[in-house]
């Protein structure tokens, strides 16, 4: 299809080209602006469902997820969207402690038991089991001929976590519907009830049954704001740019993460005085992590989609910076290649890189005063991640959309040289992570 300059696009042409870009803005807020009102008649229900498996190497985290979104059209282009997500998570996750040449014993988060990690192994907490149920609801309707508003709410529940949220977005067309400006917000109130209680930051892990350094429920609030513009350049090209701001306030610490307190010369974790691990208590000195109680994030996002003879090139870039001194870059590329009979394939490449938080530590040196904040959570460290994937999609005889997606995720991190002490130099301090993602989606 050759580019056609000098005329505005019809409403149907503009919807069909820019629909996928609208989802990128909404994903920042958790709102849902479905693809095309022209595909449904008033009174019809449209269902979009996916089943996903995510599995990490070395028997780490596994996620089995089912997600379904139902959308009903009403007269005058109004619509209601209802969403349900169920996640079942199992496996083991790093607890933050470093490897040692001797076995290490840890008190379980509940305080009612303990587990032992063999010498040389990465300390993993194998009590990572949870089920999350999330519900969303959004109402969308026009405001006049050129504006659209979407309002909604969300609730999700895990064993130790409750989320309540609201969101809203407004979008308006200009320039003969070739330019769309949008703005939105989301606000959430989250309540945390950690298993065994929330530990006092930077206090030691205690014996089984000793909860003297634990407190009760914690909470946090999160505000997200976004403004953006989508521009149709031609019949082949549409671009988008937006800016988002996120502010979190409250309990941002992970109550299940610890740091190793090490000898300032050898780098080995200090033994706990009088510890008898076989009787139920930590073998070494581990301190619970501490994070600031607020966080501000700024993000810039750009995306372009180019249509050429049925093929679609989709490229995007995101830059994020926050006051924890984390800077990240995300570059993503998709290329949709049509096949015969309404079939297609879509290769996918994603590259992500980030710097470590200013308070990230591999371990804590016992010869130095304790910092105000410290975390060994690898998610706050310096790492790069690459995702390679392939999606295969088709239409059924009943005109239903089906697709299968397979992706491989690889993450590798780096520890600043000045943080490595003594014997730590010979250990795998930031192990690589590999994961497989398989997803089956269908729409009817």
Regions found by a protein language model. Give the residues of each.
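Transmembrane beta-strands of outer-membrane beta-barrel pores
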Residues: 51-55, 86-90, 153-159, 172-174, ...
